[in-house]
């Protein structure tokens, strides 16, 4: 049998409570899987899976307004490890960048003293992963190096900046939301500030007038047009228009390029920035609850919306191909009429009051299948999306188009029997919305699903102050087997919260009183007394509540029975050292003494009894001598059984009978009534000493008042030391043995409480004042540490106690309870020292070498020919402690994830994708998503299952294409269809001539000449562009392929381009099918993204590949340095050998080796001498990197695969192995 152990280790920690209004937007969910939020001046870090507090960061001196986790969009290795970095900003303009795992500030940044409006890490991390952009009020944006705290540049703007948003598709695009409108910046760069003032636009809406209310009945396109009354203009709105200044939020849509949303309380506007117009409005019905916040998804075109009642809703864009027209109306000829987001799921609302309201929402950036709600009272509610297959009856009951589960899982289409985890991420839950007008492929098995929110995590904060705190009796050798470090916290609403201080979790919440708890005293390790008093009536009388609570059962008993109504309020309760007796002190009523064991009143003092200002029980008693007497009695009784009756004298017999009676009584009550004594002081400072034994109370001695002391407010007694505190801040130390006293003026005003630390011989004492606290050594009569509210300490102390012999507990008015070292310095702790109830999966907590070795262990299954998650079987000669930590991480994985990792049918590509999700590795997730898609496409084409179209994309992939959030990386055919759908919507929504002209330009580039001509002919005769548009319409319809006309148009186009009219020249070249030339011109003039777009929509696969390869060279150039983007473009082109070469040249050895293995499996490499050399070099370099991680077994595997290139390393590894086995 294992020895019974009790965990009583208590770490320094902070229990947090309700939030401050400034903390409203201070929350972020990192790629690392952790949620950070601001609570007053603290930053709290919790695990999203288990809802456990992992860290509380304390260094800010003011309220936190923003927190942001660093992005993980870079290649991780020993030099750039997995680490927990977080930036937090406060109302005084200070930004702190933290190493969260160690709990230390890496750097502090200060520019101005006004609240930081917004702060974000740059998402493109190829050049540097340390760049942080901040808004310093009123109108500055500053780029910082967050590693060193260096200011790189600063730029001011004309208007006050409220927030900003980076374009997730282009790192050079940044948009500012200002008090006046929106500013678009298109030349953002880490190396220098933006050049000009940016392009400023205003959002406005017409005034409602009778003319607007009497719109003619409209159908089709006009009907949709009338719904959009929002204009985006570069001029300030005129008097006829209302500027929409109440914009709550601005954000780019990560699901499709050049789209942005603007959030207003009652509507969400979707803008298409290509034509600068509103293409969709999500409005709330009149009775609906207004929006507070919206988070757009990237994996699917969906929106997480937070409403004012705390309800989170998920809206997903409707797919139109599955809607059948059932009405008698004529069906619309144009399939796309409206950009509609259907409500797909919503969670329960919270009860909103004056003090309890939703603050903010964050969404899991890795999987986009969970949202966390931060409530003002300190609660964190984690809602997870779950998918369920619809039953036939439930289908289409709501009237919205159905959602289907995707064909593939982790990037690869799987069979019906393959293990899947549909709730892994949003894109594994629901398939893509098909492009409008496109039917689902015949014969494909589509399962209709519906989504629901499930509350999977709840973290509750402390209620708002006031607090009365009391630590349970201390650990001793006698209670070591049952001891738990419990802290009782009395609250203002009458409940008592009991916290387990090893884990910091709420152990029990007990509703004990009907009003504020004034004090708590423990009567044993499992029971306590608490008291409260109602508001005084006109006579100053109250209803006193004194309850005895049994913790295991939660049962609460009125300790004083029916007493308590209409009497003077209880001032304090004091439990004797042996927990036998209770002294109850009232404000204007004599003292009561009670027996705790029997709940009986021993004595109510007479009315002449002096008023008590302070009282304390003595630690000395006569229990030991009583026990000795009891033992002697037992021995005498034992002797009595041996001696004959005749030999007994009459006197001895009567003594024995009395002792037997006493013994039986003691056994009945299971307790001996020992003599205990206490001291108290009156208003004059006189000290009284009383003795209590059984039901007798005796007055022992009186000590006259000390002239140097004011009115005594508190007493503490331990061993031979008695300490008194007074109203004037004096502490008087009495040495009872030496009969000397020493008065110390602390100059700290009223001494509110003094308490000795637990532990034999520990003479430390904590004293609490109005403005702070001090720890004293009463042996030396010296102050050990001090804490004073003020500039450096932002909180005021409400109550104090000792947690252990060397740690104190402070309850403060910021709603927090801090467990601190005796120095009382607020310090963060190392996260790996935390005692957690549930294991937490977070490889970021491991040392860098171990985190990377664990990743290799998961990726390269099976080991020793079998799939295993037991690392002890692996030849990994690190110290046992690290191996134990790795095994703990593996145990923390969910059973569903373990099942996938141990599945032999789970392919290498799927494993890479899953591990990138588990690690929250943004860079790897994007790489393996695109790699899996195109490698699988290639294998399908090679196997002959599909016909390869001339664009190079197998046809079956068009029914399961790469998500449009990957933009130009998608298959050409799918990309073209998406662009046509988009221009359809733009055409339907156009509301001005300017919009019409932009639509015409797009249609001409897309080759939709007939529709372009229709729009050109719509120009009215009084428009200044009427003549040009008419001629252009004639030109477009009469363009022939004859040599002379082509030559003329080409000459005009090149002249236009040379004279600064690039867009017009490109358009003319597209008219004569010279789109390849147009792309070259665009690239020459630096319009690389536009050239890629045009190549995708107009060129055949070979020409398109040429354009994109030139773009790759540009992206890899030192001045651009976007190699990670270049890798994705090469993957989309099927240039797999080039990808492997580039990965190797970038020293991404782990990714290169895995990619080579996947390519060999899918037959993606043409075998040649060069490729074989490349593969051997990659394997050898990867083996060396595994050796540097200490992962010898992995190093041996890849060194042996590298052939001649790995021979030396293999010999080296072999000799190391022999040395180890010999030792």
Curated annotation (Swiss-Prot):
SUPFAM superfamilies: Putative isomerase YbhE (SSF101908), WD40 repeat-like (SSF50978). It is found in: Cytoplasm, Cytoskeleton, Cilium basal body; Cytoplasm; Nucleus; Cytoplasm, Cytoskeleton, Cilium axoneme. Its main location: cytoplasm. The keyword Phosphoprotein applies. InterPro entries: WD40/YVTN_repeat-like_dom_sf, WD40_repeat_CS, WD40_repeat_dom_sf, WD40_rpt, WDR11. It comes from the Eukaryota. Disruption phenotype: Mutants show retardation of growth and development with mid-gestation embryonic lethality, delayed puberty, reproductive dysfunctions and obesity. The rare mutant survivors through adulthood exhibit abnormal digit separation and syndactyly, as well as shortened limbs and hypoplastic skeletons with reduced or absent bone mineralization. Their head show a diminutive and curved nasal midline and a small lower jaw with microcephaly, closely spaced eyes or single/absent eyes. They have hypothalamic gonadotropin-releasing hormone (GnRH) deficiency and pituitary dysgenesis. GO terms for biological process: cilium assembly; head development; heart development; intracellular protein transport; multicellular organism growth; regulation of smoothened signaling pathway; vesicle tethering to Golgi. Broadly expressed in various organs including brain, eye,ear, lung, heart, kideny and gonads. Cerebral cortex. The entire developing central nervous system, except for the spinal cord, reveals expression. Expressed in the neuroepithelium, including the diencephalic region that gives rise to hypothalamic neurons. In the adult brain, intense expression is restricted to the olfactory bulb, the olfaction-related piriform cortex, the granule cell layer of the cerebellum, and neurons of the hippocampal formation. Component of the complex WDR11 composed of C17orf75, FAM91A1 and WDR11; FAM91A1 and WDR11 are required for proper location of the complex. Interacts with GLI3; the interaction associateS EMX1 with GLI3. Interacts with TBC1D23; this interaction may be indirect and recruits TBC1D23 to AP-1-derived vesicles. Interacts (via the N-terminal and the central portion of the protein) with EMX1. PANTHER family: WD REPEAT-CONTAINING PROTEIN 11 (PTHR14593:SF5). This is WD repeat-containing protein 11. It comes from Mus musculus.
